[in-house]
């Protein structure tokens, strides 16, 4: 009986052999993922090829570091150790490292994250913010020692010298780079003096640029209140930061040009154009007013100003006639009424009362006549004043008082600034006009 081993003893012996075998401590395998269903923590599945299958396990801590998602049927290269599980007597592979076969892990991770973020709408054009035409201050998130910041400063200074640049010194590759990029984007968004951000770095391998493919960086750019221009790597390099940014620039110089779409020279040209337009508009307005003034000076109102108030005189005559008629008729009515009352009172032998009413009637009659005369006289005085004011506008009366009107090309002159020596002028006087030539022009304020 002592020659027989128990199942447990055999299993322990085999486990010891597996654990001590140096060839099984670190195994490199290529296989196809099978029976895979993602779990919240540890991952359990099979690796197979055309002739065999082995159970595989990836502990949760390792799975977080491999950087890509496993998929059913995916061919992967793994590094791990073989162990025996004593209760079942089965052996399995404990995977410590894994990467896709035929494609780099970072490339696969990039593609998987790109698909995920695309499905979530991070790269939709409807989320893109427009870049401002004019900026006062630009925030730049990049390394302080690289060529990126020098190219940006040079280009912005050339295109629009007045624009300020605020550098946020940032680690752009290696451990902690993604977190530092996120922190500086958040700092920039807390400032009120920035108009937009440029986020970028120079060229490099996919590993060097990887910080700009991290999901936290993409989310930070997406949530930025400030418009973001991405300039990562060379023209052929593409990162997820480029997809989510409001604009992507192939080079730092191109990013600076996008940040200052209208240069100082363009702005000055635009201002000069607007000034010229305003000047031409003023000239046209002045010419229009001069022509209108010339036409008005030849109108009937200026040549025969008395016609301006002819209608008012006729209306005043009609109103005066109506007033006189009304006063006369009213007086007659009151006189008849008084006579009627006098006769009634006389018939009642109330001589004293009649006498009082007669006195009152005569007093009212005198008051009415006086009021009527005063009203008519007042209206006549106002009419005469209006008539005198209008007559004062008559150029013939002005000339009659000893003044003269100087015309140039049949237009009245109001200033010597419109006269040059040698010009022919016409002087209108009371009894005729003179044709004169200007010999000298002396400016003098009166």
From Swiss-Prot:
Protein family (similarity comment): Belongs to the XseA family.
EC number(s) reported in the record: 3.1.11.6
Oligomeric and partner information: Heterooligomer composed of large and small subunits.
Protein's name in the database: Exodeoxyribonuclease 7 large subunit
Biological process terms in GO annotation: DNA catabolic process
Regions annotated as coiled coil: none
Pfam families: Exonuc_VII_L, tRNA_anti_2
UniProt catalytic activity: Exonucleolytic cleavage in either 5'- to 3'- or 3'- to 5'-direction to yield nucleoside 5'-phosphates
Function: Bidirectionally degrades single-stranded DNA into large acid-insoluble oligonucleotides, which are then degraded further into small acid-soluble oligonucleotides.
Primary site of residence: cytoplasm
GO molecular function terms attached to this record: exodeoxyribonuclease VII activity; nucleic acid binding
